Structures are given as structure tokens and as C-alpha cells.
Amino acid sequence: LDLTPGSHVDSYVEA
């Protein structure tokens, strides 16, 4: 899981 700020995952997790 790529939980780095601005990653593809964080893109919709913190949206």
C-alpha cells in the first residue's frame, strides 16, 4: 500500500 501524501492511494483516501 502506498500511503505517501500525493500517491495514487492517498489521492482518494484523503479526498
UniProtKB/Swiss-Prot annotation:
Pfam families: Pea-VEAacid (PF08111)
Origin superkingdom: Eukaryota
Membrane-crossing residue ranges in chain numbering: none
InterPro entries in the cross-refs: Pea-VEAacid
Record keyword Protease present: no
GO biological process entries: neuropeptide signaling pathway
Keywords for the protein's UniProt record, in alphabetical order: Neuropeptide
Signal peptide start-end: none
GO molecular function, a single term: neuropeptide hormone activity
Protein name, entry field: Peptide hormone 2
A cellular component annotation (GO) from this entry: extracellular region
